[in-house]
Amino acid sequence: MSENPPTLFSAYKMGNFNLSHRVVLAPMTRCRAINAIPNEALVEYYRQRSTAGGFLITEGTMISPSSAGFPHVPGIFTKEQVEGWKKVVDAAHKEGAVIFCQLWHVGRASHQVYQPGGAAPISSTSKPISKKWEILLPDATYGTYPEPRPLAANEILEVVEDYRVAAINAIEAGFDGIEIHGAHGYLLDQFMKDGINDRTDEYGGSLENRCKFILQVVQAVSAAIATDRVLIRISPAIDHTDAMDSDPRSLGLAVIERLNKLQFKLGSRLAYLHVTQPRYTADGHGQTEAGANGSEEEVAQLMKTWRGAYVGTFICCGGYTRELGLQAVAQGDADLVAFGRYFVSNPDLVLRLKLNAPLNRYDRATFYTHDPVVGYTDYPSLDKGSLL
């Protein structure tokens, strides 16, 4: 007699971690870490969204002073930042959750106002992000992205080291692992996408060369903290901030093939692969909506192709509803499903999805504001007493 297919609420073993359900908190920038230091507001935010056996991925966390591209995002490159994160991690662990830190460098998706000494942001290229897109500045206005400075080959190794040290700091803070942000038009994506990367050295041109930087990061971080604590997020078909590729399907397969080979070489699997699918689109301010970037059938086929190629845990993300999440898991198209905006407005999202209860609407106007409560920790949870 065949077993029933898994659901969003089935248990799952992710490497060494036993999860009680498959609903994941997606990483989301929230701009509440004043002066880049995790504070009590972040402690409460992540505590609210923690469940026994649940899995959380933090917002993008800066690996170095040059990696910033938003106001008041947290870092993990100073002792004070590490100490701040310890409180967040402790709160999540007390609720029984597993929590990973997303390591982030925005590359050219920055501005001189965020850079040490007012320097130009770094990238694979000198091509700026087009004026279709705008960057949120510290005074809450929006500006134009400046021309970046292409990294020299030897400087790339310095950034690899920044990732390695940040990963070590994350483990010191108590995190269960780290996610390398290689998606959404940020630094590592700027090297992988041929619509951005115009280099003629060993980091440009062929798929092999364009994947070199991200694989160096994965190898360095894996050597520092253990392969099964490392995961990677990619978005081959997402064109956020002009991050276009001429053949997203092949790019995704190229990254996956190399990750599979690396896992075999290291003798241990990565924690997971996290893929944002083309249902994710964005307006010029980087605020996302589920939209039709290709037909639903094309979207589904891309994800099926990548999922089928990857050896290991596969997380999907990007505009998922309860129904789409249930379908993805039941059909084997994903092991886990990450939810973003509705986790912002529903700290008890796991319970609401399980009960098929109504969801609080999110307030887009407070996504990137700095109030420690409003639009951050003040969304109501279900009255559990009334459910008994």
Curated annotation (Swiss-Prot):
One of its GO terms (cellular component) is cytosol. The lineage of its organism: Eukaryota, Viridiplantae, Streptophyta, Embryophyta, Tracheophyta. Belongs to the NADH:flavin oxidoreductase/NADH oxidase family. Keywords: Cytoplasm, Flavoprotein, FMN, NADP, Oxidoreductase. Its cofactor is FMN. This is Artemisinic aldehyde Delta(11(13)) reductase. Artemisinin and derivatives (e.g. artesunate), are antimalarial drugs due to their endoperoxidase properties; they also display multiple pharmacological actions against inflammation,viral infections, and cell and tumor proliferation. Artesunate may be a promising treatment for COVID-19 mediated by the severe acute respiratory syndrome coronavirus 2 (2019-nCoV) (SARS-CoV-2) because of its anti-inflammatory activity, NF-kappaB (nuclear factor kappa B)-coronavirus effect and chloroquine-like endocytosis inhibition mechanism. The gene is DBR2. Optimum pH is 7.5.
